[in-house]
UniProtKB/Swiss-Prot annotation:
The gene is pva. Its EC number is 3.5.1.11. One of its GO terms (biological process) is response to antibiotic. It comes from the Bacteria. It comes from Pectobacterium atrosepticum (strain SCRI 1043 / ATCC BAA-672) (Erwinia carotovora subsp. atroseptica). This is Penicillin V acylase.
């Protein structure tokens, strides 16, 4: 199923959803958005935050072309060979059977992000030889390995060539339930969710923001309600996903760095690009949860551990840890993504992503064997 730019204007429905979301806890609080500066329209930027109660054990990886992959779904796993190289942020890659790709960008400028969605329900059909399985832990990587644009990825995903599978979160009585966002160098965007066992794709350049619960169609309803109020009058300010969605949506549409930096419009493309990067970082920080903040009765409201920003046109991947004084970045143009005989490269970020890097960090990656995706 695919939904394209459907506007929902029912205020009554929106008010009901506001009441519903105020009464529910968020399982995992992350935010993702695509910033499209109307004064710099050919320069899209994607930013995301990772909020989690414990150390996500995140590292950065360089994956080359022609890397053989298995989808982590047991006997009938989807198998493929990567067409494009990528730089990604992992989670739990030090734990056998737990690793995943949570965020990243490939050499063509396609970005992928997975965020928590408690309402996710994946197909109950078991993988077979004719229709193999793909673990949610490998979902983002599959897209980065195989596609150059959002449109190309969406057209392939619509064919449903695989069955998406999940497993219980280690030490918890719940399944890993995620949804996927995609964005590219044209500013195109897509949100892919599994609701009631069926794939739902929201594909439009207008779908710039994604958080967690509720489902994306309901987030659009909430946003329509707040649009009527107007962000200059009042914006919801809690750490809940619905509130972060509204705040991020307001700012990505209303910020104007040209007003803040004198003469930026006349200083040329480089200065405009710098201003847009600063804007993206400021918005994602606004949607972040302060480090060390938690609620005793709501353990799933968690601190922001790290943030990433993707410069799709310059092919730069920025990383900011909550416990490091520096932002650093990886310039994909400086990386040789040619096949490496099955090997990859890893940038060890240390416990709680506390290892300090500065500036362009591609030279600090060390050869490493790719991790295996968490699976059945």
């Amino acid at each position: 199923m695919i939904k394209n730019n459907k506007r929902i204007k029912s205020t009554v429905c929106a008010l009901s959803l506001v009441a519903l979301t105020l009464g529910s806890a968020v399982s995992l609080a992350c935010t993702r958005f695509v910033y499209l500066d109307p004064h710099n329209p050919d320069y899209p930027i994607t930013a995301r935050s990772m909020d989690w109660a414990d150390d996500t054990e995140t590292n950065l990886w360089i994956f080359p072309q022609e890397l053989k992959r298995s989808g982590g779904a047991g006997q009938y796993s989807l198998e493929w060979t990567s067409k494009y190289g990528s730089v990604i942020a992992s989670a739990f890659d030090g734990r056998k059977g737990m690793a995943s790709t949570t965020d990243g960008v490939n050499e063509k400028g396609l970005a992928a992000n997975v965020l928590w969605l408690a309402e996710s329900e994946y197909p109950k059909t078991k993988p077979t030889a004719k229709k193999p399985g793909l673990s949610v832990a490998a979902w983002a990587q599959y897209v980065l390995d195989n596609f150059a644009t959002v449109d190309e990825a969406v057209k392939s995903l619509q064919q449903e060539k695989f069955i998406l599978v999940t497993k219980q979160v280690e030490g918890q009585k719940r399944l890993a339930t995620l949804h996927l966002s995609l964005s590219d160098s044209s500013g195109d965007s897509a949100i892919i969710e599994y609701i009631d066992g069926k794939q739902v794709i929201h594909h439009s350049k207008n779908y710039q923001v994604m958080t967690n619960s509720p489902t994306f169609d309901q987030q659009l309803t909430l946003n329509a309600y707040w649009d009527q109020i107007g962000g200059n009058v009042m914006l919801p300010g809690t750490n809940r996903a619905a509130d972060r969605f509204v705040r991020a949506s307001f700012y990505v549409k209303n910020v104007n760095p040209n007003k803040l930096i004198p003469g930026v419009a006349e200083k040329g493309k480089i200065e405009k690009d710098k201003a847009d990067l600063a804007t993206a970082f400021s918005i994602i920080r606004n949607a972040s949860v302060p480090y060390g903040y938690s609620l005793p009765d709501m353990p799933n409201i968690a601190s922001t551990r790290w943030r990433t920003v993707v410069d799709h046109k310059s092919l730069q991947y920025f990383f900011e840890s909550a416990v490091s004084p520096n932002i650093f970045w990886v310039d994909l143009k400086k990386i040789n993504f040619a096949p490496r005989g099955g090997s990859a490269a890893k940038l060890d970020l240390g416990p709680n992503q506390s290892t300090i890097y500065s500036g362009q960090a591609s030279g600090h990656f060390k050869p490493a064997q790719p991790f295996e995706f968490a699976g059945l």
